[in-house]
Design a protein with these regions (language model features):
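Short, well-ordered secondary-structure "scaffold" segments embedded in the functional core
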Residues: 188, 211-217, 292, 323-325, ...
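Short amphipathic alpha-helical "interface-anchor" segments enriched in bulky aromatics
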Residues: 108, 112, 212, 257, ...
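Catalytic-loop motifs flanking and including active-site residues across diverse enzymes
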Residues: 139, 312, 338, 368-371
Length: 417
């Protein structure tokens, strides 16, 4: 059993000069900056995010990162000419080039950033699953790539509440582009999915939680795009046992509760900190029922704790074909762990939630640099795995909370010298 310990993952002290590994990683991205000084500002910003100091705003980073100042860091996020979307696309293609198992899935989820005041772009009193309540916050919709042994962020988009989208004065003050209009979180997720198609990101399926899985328009959007998916749904998800109208719609939990215990089988999906993660599962071929009565063939999957385990039942829906092994769908849906882990780590370790500006572009540039910084850590871990092949089953995807950044960078230094 592999025991994991929560550790600090940040650099204990900012070096006076560039880290050789970071310089190598960032070299391909310098093409997005017209001047060397501009690219150097990006390197200093990333270095600041990797530092152990808990505050990651421009003022604080300028005070602890040599070779820069608050004005340069702020200029990088606001007025400097560079295309953050194009840089992010290049980063995604770079990460896809890493030798890996190639069995990735696309994860979508949203996360909240608690805020004071009313001027930060998109901030409003709104519900966020991060806080489990209505509170003053910003919310982003995010896309993540996850294989069994490699996981990293793809894209993020700020959710713009209707009160912001329809307020011309606030839009102008926050520099919100004209093309950005009100969209639901599910609609934003579908747009991010379309972007992954344009980049040609190979993937086996889409995985989301019940906030998206219980959204018929989202599922219909996936099917219209010919996407396979395994999604979490709520207990009252509407299904029917047959296609004809004589088969009435029923709640998912009622149907699964009627199944005999002997029909449920134990499946384990990965190793956790306390051993194998496993539970009892049952799958039923049936139809989901839209609000207008339209029926779509797929799998209703139930999960309940095994003997001696605590926890509540969970429900999933998938449009995988009839011959798909249940073990495959179970393993896919539980990869959602990696986007939740990223949300926690990008905030706690890299300062994703600490952008203090008020503008749309600055918010997204900061997020792009956070994703770049996270990808740097994943890349370092990937390099070490290439030189330190281990026997036995593949290791889980890298997570910064499993190994300190200082150790990762120190070990990588021997590779780069």
């Amino acid at each position: 059993m592999r025991v994991r310990t929560k550790v600090d993952t940040r650099l204990p002290q900012v070096p006076q000069t560039q880290l050789s590994a970071l310089a190598e990683f960032l070299a391909p991205f310098r093409v997005h900056f017209a001047q060397a000084n501009s690219a150097n500002n990006l390197e200093r910003y990333v270095t600041g995010l990797l530092n152990e100091h808990p505050n990651k705003n421009c003022d604080t980073m300028a005070s602890v990162v040599p070779g820069t100042n608050q004005q340069r860091l702020h200029h990088l996020l606001t007025e400097m000419l560079w295309d953050e979307a194009e840089l992010n696309r290049q980063r995604v293609k770079w990460m896809l080039s890493l030798d890996s198992e190639g069995d990735g899935v696309l994860l979508f989820d949203d996360t909240g950033f608690g805020k004071q005041g009313t001027h930060s772009v998109g901030v409003a009193r709104q519900y966020s699953g991060t806080f489990g309540k209505v509170t003053n916050c910003q919310v982003t919709v995010n896309c993540h790539y996850a294989e069994r042994t490699l996981a990293w962020p793809i894209a993020t988009r700020l959710y713009l509440p209707r009160v912001w989208a329809e307020d011309g004065v606030r839009r102008q003050q926050a520099h919100i582009p004209e093309g950005i209009q009100f969209q639901t979180k599910a609609e934003i997720a579908l747009e991010l999915l379309d972007e992954t198609t344009r980049i040609a990101i190979p993937h086996a399926c889409v995985v989301v939680d019940a906030d998206y899985g219980d959204h018929p328009h989202f599922l219909n959007g996936l099917e219209a795009r010919r996407e396979r998916y395994v999604v979490a749904v709520r207990c009252d998800f509407s299904i029917a046992l047959g296609r004809g109208r004589e088969h009435r719609a029923q709640r998912a939990d009622k149907v699964l509760q009627a199944q005999p215990l002997r029909a449920w089988g134990t499946i384990h999906w990965r190793e956790g900190s306390r051993g194998r993660l496993r539970a009892k599962f049952f799958a039923l071929r049936c139809y989901r029922v839209d609000g207008d009565g339209t029926r779509h063939l797929g799998w209703l999957i139930g999960q309940r704790p095994g003997w001696g385990q605590a926890g509540e039942g969970k429900y999933f829906w998938s449009n995988f074909p009839a011959h798909t092994p249940l073990e495959v769908m179970v393993e896919y849906t539980h990869r959602r762990y990696w986007i939740e882990q990223y949300h926690e780590e990008a905030k706690g370790e890299l300062g994703w939630d600490q952008y203090q500006g008020r503008h749309w572009d600055g918010f997204h540039r900061h997020a792009v640099i956070v994703m770049l910084s996270y990808s740097f850590l994943v890349w370092l871990e990937w390099q070490q795995r290439q030189t330190q092949r281990r026997r036995g089953p593949p290791r889980d995807a890298f997570s910064p909370t499993t190994r300190p950044t200082a150790v990762i960078i120190a070990q990588s230094a021997s590779v780069h010298h």
